[in-house]
């Protein structure tokens, strides 16, 4: 496990796309007007992060960072709705923090079973049966499913422990965790043996708490030297700190007092999240380890008075000989109990059932200028959740669907706001502000029942209805009269040439009357 511990990873999550609605008409013998029967599309699956007690690392997400939920199924005829896509549940360790690509805190997952919907799936499109109304009895179109949300998530694990053991490498922190609990971390006689945080559960009387063995710190850890920045964040959740000092250190330039000052300096330089207690202000205990070595006992007697001046209790212990551990465990239990008692009691959440807002009802129309100084152009941009969602649901290959979109925008008040912003017929209008924005030339909507008179799948408002000018009308009238005179001359020439019969002449006389 020590070589495969991963506590930071970037996940590319993609929610499932919603299924398209179905545009179909009921067909049955002796029922010529069966009506629309297209079903709705299914909802896309969500990508969900869930705390799993059996998961202790983000290794699986590092190996497979791209996670996509299944899409919703398409609607079908006979009022058959498409099936929803299954949710993709990803297990993460307890204490996982979820941030956006910009660094915004999205979720802090603490406690088994805690869930966070990381990438919601798209909603399914409505079938033509759901779109039928008194004016549009048999829609020849259906709405498309919405695409699922796609985003990058930065996951970070911060160890959940009550007490953190900090100190220089080879100070005996792992041995101390193994002696206090049933944990079996890797222990060796060389520095930086511990490369991952090790957790152990300690029982002192009626108090049960967890202890974390943080990898060794060195001067400059808060600036990234050694393994400092990678594992100092695992100390953030601890309510108390235990300084483990090496009493049997053989280096001439180090002693327990200088080691304590160096570690305190690094803890003070480390910046915690907003609202958290700084590391240097948290309760602490000082432990001189390796008391089984004669030189360590002598060193403890020399520096004990200087260490007690720091304002923290000092314990001389031996993780190998198991001496002084009982007193140390009860001292740590007192700090944990005091911290737990100081926490405010959790107020039971009152469950209130109320309608959930679908989305933001508002929108905004802005005037934009673009281009160089010599060729300045103007366009109008419509921003809002509803217009953007409606555009995503529209099948622009179907004229009737485009007309339905125009009606929805007009009822929402978009056209009125475009007029107020100075838009004129033919102006460039953009809906949305992302890569899926739609650009079109705006024409005011006609409400004279065009959606009723048009054929299925068409909209008369999208056809060419340009009115001729006065000169064009005069020219058309002259051409009509000239064509009429030409036709009469041709008929007269045929009659004089003897091509007409008596019956033809009788018909001509009747037409003249």
Swiss-Prot record:
Cofactor: Mg(2+)
Domain OCT positions: 355-444
Cell location: Cytoplasm
Positions of disulphide bridges: none
Region feature Disordered, mapped onto this chain: 457-513
CDD domains: Obg (cd01898)
Residues the entry annotates as binding Mg(2+): 174, 194
Chain positions recorded as GTP binding sites: 167-174, 192-196, 213-216, 289-292, 318-320
Domain annotation OBG-type G: ranges: 161-337
One Pfam family it belongs to: DUF1967
Keywords for this protein: Cytoplasm, GTP-binding, Hydrolase, Magnesium, Metal-binding, Nucleotide-binding
Chain's role: An essential GTPase which binds GTP, GDP and possibly (p)ppGpp with moderate affinity, with high nucleotide exchange rates and a fairly low GTP hydrolysis rate. Plays a role in control of the cell cycle, stress response, ribosome biogenesis and in those bacteria that undergo differentiation, in morphogenesis control.
Name of the featured protein: GTPase Obg
Organism for this UniProt entry: Kineococcus radiotolerans (strain ATCC BAA-149 / DSM 14245 / SRS30216)
Gene: obg
